[in-house]
From Swiss-Prot:
Its EC number is 2.7.1.21. It catalyses: thymidine + ATP = dTMP + ADP + H(+). The lineage of its organism: Viruses, Varidnaviria, Bamfordvirae, Nucleocytoviricota, Pokkesviricetes. InterPro entries: P-loop_NTPase, Thymidine_kinase, Thymidine_kinase_CS. ATP binds at residues 17-24. It comes from African swine fever virus (isolate Tick/Malawi/Lil 20-1/1983). Substrate binds at residues 121, 166-170. Belongs to the thymidine kinase family. This is Thymidine kinase. It holds the Pfam family TK.
Length: 188
């Protein structure tokens, strides 16, 4: 199915999944499609994500766009005017406590596309994601295979160290995504 048919002005689309599932890759694909339709796109990333200043996936895929503006912010309410923008794309949406701000942008007839984790390392949903759910006209779940057994669908994000900080940006050096069987066996 062509995703572009789902991305309508005034709607919020949400892409969820565990780490390393391809959510950012999906967003990059959406940005390219929107740009082909001559839509002005802004990509918002959290300053809490300290891994890279560009739009780049864990697997190294990087957005190659001269038109897409990248905004780094701690809160969405700090983002300036988006008057001339057609689409707002937000990666790591769970990092934004004021994710509900997207509703106001949707009311301004902007296309909103969010990507975030399905759950924390404690296997609990992030509250900003929970609060935006009722306003999403389309929700997509992207899964991946367990990084330990390579047999089952993985939906659990597990931190490799004992740090209990809720938000701790990192990649495979800090996290593993595993299935329920490996989580129960603590095979990470």
């Amino acid at each position: 199915m062509n995703i572009i048919r789902k991305l309508k002005p005034g709607t919020i689309s949400l892409v969820l999944g565990p780490m390393f599932a391809g959510k950012t890759t999906f967003l990059i694909h959406c940005i390219y499609m929107l740009e082909r339709l001559e839509k002005k796109v802004v990509f918002i990333k959290s300053t809490k994500n300290t891994r890279d200043k560009t739009i780049k996936t864990h697997s190294g895929i990087q957005l190659q766009s001269k038109q897409c503006e990248i905004i780094e912010s701690t809160q969405l309410s700090d983002v300036g005017s988006l008057t001339d923008i057609h689409a707002v794309v937000i990666d790591e949406a769970h990092f934004f406590d004021d994710l509900i701000k997207c509703r106001a942008w949707a009311d301004e007839e902007k296309i909103i596309i969010l990507a975030g984790l399905n759950a924390s390392f404690e296997q609990k949903m992030f509250q900003p994601i929970v609060h935006i759910f009722p306003y999403c006209s389309w929700i997509k779940y992207i899964g991946r295979t367990c990084m330990k057994c390579n047999r089952h669908n993985a939906c659990f994000n597990v931190r490799k160290n004992a740090d209990k900080t809720l938000i701790l940006a990192g990649g495979s050096e800090l996290y593993v995504t595993c299935c329920n069987n490996c989580l129960k066996k603590q095979m990470y």
